[in-house]
């Protein structure tokens, strides 16, 4: 019953992404004028760290969809506030949160390492909007991990845990939109 709601929420999220992709993208558009040999990749971006960095960030962002789905399903379920139900959805949410946070950590670390040695900014972090777009879900994910532990062990912060699970995924979406839409430039 509860897992069906979780899968339903994930299905709605996936369907939303499908609709967005269909509405905004056309893989059959032609480039005018056509690039004879292609435009090649910027030499700064031809690096091993950047082969791994974007997929790690992506897996971290997408991984937060599962705790989000559990939180929304818990809000929709009347029995979700019972101690047994809370313990169950916390037990299922925690591994997904840890994995998503781990991927996001690796992605941020690789991006910082690349920026340090390739761009020579003189540091690992420059407070660039692109960096902060991945840092905000990471901070909320860190708070979510600790809130999950407190809720699991002492039964406190239930509402806070739900809010953090929703915020982690929402900030992942917002950060992706801001960085990839061209609203913010780095």
Where in the sequence are the language-model features?
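Polytopic transmembrane helical bundles with strong interfacial aromatic enrichment
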Residues: 1-186
């Amino acid at each position: 019953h509860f897992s069906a709601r979780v899968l339903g929420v994930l299905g709605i999220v996936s369907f939303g992404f499908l609709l967005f992709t269909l509405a905004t993208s056309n893989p059959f558009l032609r480039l005018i004028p056509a690039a004879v040999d292609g435009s090649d990749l910027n030499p700064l971006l031809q690096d091993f760290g950047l082969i791994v960095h974007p997929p790690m960030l992506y897996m971290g962002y997408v991984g937060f969809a599962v705790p989000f789905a559990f939180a929304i399903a818990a809000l929709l379920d009347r029995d979700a506030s019972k101690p047994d139900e809370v313990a169950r959805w916390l037990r299922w949410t925690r591994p997904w949160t840890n994995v998503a946070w781990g991927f996001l950590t690796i992605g941020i670390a690789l991006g910082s390492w690349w920026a340090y040695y390739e761009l020579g900014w003189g540091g690992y972090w420059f407070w660039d909007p692109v960096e902060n777009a991945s840092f905000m879900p990471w901070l909320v994910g860190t708070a979510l991990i600790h809130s999950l532990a407190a809720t699991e062990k002492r039964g406190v912060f239930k509402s806070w845990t739900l809010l953090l699970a929703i915020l982690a995924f929402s900030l992942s979406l917002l950060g992706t939109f801001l960085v990839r839409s061209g609203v913010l430039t780095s």
